[in-house]
């Protein structure tokens, strides 16, 4: 599920590991034995008017498709008034920022700037996610 929400600054590729934050609203709830097992929530904080953020849109769609029912992809446009609260909630300093949450909603990785799909693949595979084709 890719949520389009909708402007900021950009610095190429800064990564930060393990920031202890939990967002209960984004924790995947497996309420039945047949529900898909979501392992990761990928939160993209950016804007539809930010050029590097726009470049992340196809990456997010591809990741969502490749990892299907193992990942939830969420996009917040922090330049829209109703979504600015997420910039504060996640403590972002620039956009785009990608925040990755484990199945319990705990942040395990954060990246600032454009994040290439190949690097996201490596991160997700370290977390045990498999592509639809199994690799």
Segments (PLM) and residue ranges:
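N-terminal targeting signals for export/organelle localization
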Residues: 1-25, 135
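A short beta-strand-turn-helix
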Residues: 18-40, 84
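Short pre-active-site segment immediately N-terminal to redox-active cysteine/selenocysteine motifs
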Residues: 41, 46-49, 94
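Thiol-based oxidoreductase modules, predominantly thioredoxin-like and allied folds used
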Residues: 45, 69-83
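The canonical Cys-X-X-Cys-His
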Residues: 50-53, 98
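Non-catalytic, surface beta->alpha helical segment in thiol-disulfide oxidoreductase systems
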Residues: 94, 99-135
């Amino acid at each position: 599920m890719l949520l389009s929400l909708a402007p900021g600054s950009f610095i190429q590729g800064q990564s930060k590991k393990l920031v202890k934050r939990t967002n209960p609203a984004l924790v995947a709830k497996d309420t039945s034995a047949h529900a898909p097992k979501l392992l990761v929530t990928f939160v993209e904080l950016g804007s539809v008017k930010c050029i590097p953020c726009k470049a992340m849109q196809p990456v997010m769609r591809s990741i969502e498709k490749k990892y299907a029912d193992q990942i939830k992809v969420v996009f917040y446009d922090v330049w829209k008034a109703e979504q600015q609260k997420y910039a504060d909630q996640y403590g972002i300093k620039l956009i785009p920022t990608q925040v990755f949450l484990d199945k319990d909603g705990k942040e395990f990785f954060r990246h600032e700037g454009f994040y290439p799909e190949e690097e996201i693949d490596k991160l997700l595979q370290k977390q045990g996610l498999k592509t639809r084709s199994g690799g």
